[in-house]
């Protein structure tokens, strides 16, 4: 009587491994990995073959340098894993990225009078990953800075993933005197000196 030995290697399965999402908007540093088990492993250093559908067609259990759609802020990648018997399993995994980090600056309180230092500016931040840090050109470290005089102010924002954005603004001050009226009287005759100009102004503050 002949005998047949049947090896039961277990069900061939592929599960998700570690995921590293993209750190900053439009970077390409995402990572995905899969873990395969069962089936009929290849003999040697590689038990299974892998094929990712990224633009490089990576062929290892971990795909690196992955980009994400800039509109939806996520992208699915498929990995096809094959064992020595030709059995295949496909796993679809998602990589996400934060919205673009952006900052602008608003004047919450303009300088009230020429030569004073009572202006206020506020940095308005969207996107990125909380929390934010603020670095102003005048040494400020919060979203709002005050006691400001005439000049250019620059703020740099950094989020939890060390993504950065900057914004620069010129803070003006009122003029010291506002000209209301200019009176002109022309010289009556050649050689005379009876013409004059009179300027009427108002001190603003």
Question: Where do the language-model regions lie?
Answer:
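Short beta-strand segments within Ig-like beta-sandwich modules, predominantly Fibronectin type-III
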Residues: 53-59, 135-141, 147
């Amino acid at each position: 009587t002949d005998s047949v030995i049947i090896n039961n290697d277990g069900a061939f399965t592929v599960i998700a491994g570690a995921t590293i999402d993209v750190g900053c908007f439009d970077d390409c540093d995402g990572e995905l990995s899969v873990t395969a088990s069962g089936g009929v492993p290849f003999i040697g250093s590689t038990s299974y073959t892998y094929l990712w559908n990224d633009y490089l067609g990576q062929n290892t259990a971990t795909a690196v340098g992955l980009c994400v759609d800039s509109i939806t802020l996520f992208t699915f990648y498929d990995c096809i894993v094959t064992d020595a018997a030709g059995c295949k399993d496909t796993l679809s995994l998602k990589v996400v990225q934060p919205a673009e980090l952006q900052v602008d600056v608003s004047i919450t309180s303009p300088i009230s009078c020429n030569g004073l230092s009572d202006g206020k500016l506020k940095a308005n931040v969207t996107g990125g990953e909380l929390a934010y840090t603020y670095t102003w050109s005048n040494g400020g470290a919060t979203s709002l800075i005050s006691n400001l005089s005439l000049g250019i102010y620059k703020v740099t924002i950094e989020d939890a993933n060390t993504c950065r954005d900057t914004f620069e603004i010129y803070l003006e001050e009122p003029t010291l005197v506002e000209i209301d009226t200019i009176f002109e009287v022309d010289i009556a005759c050649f050689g005379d000196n009876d013409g004059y100009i009179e300027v009427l102004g108002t001190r603003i503050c």
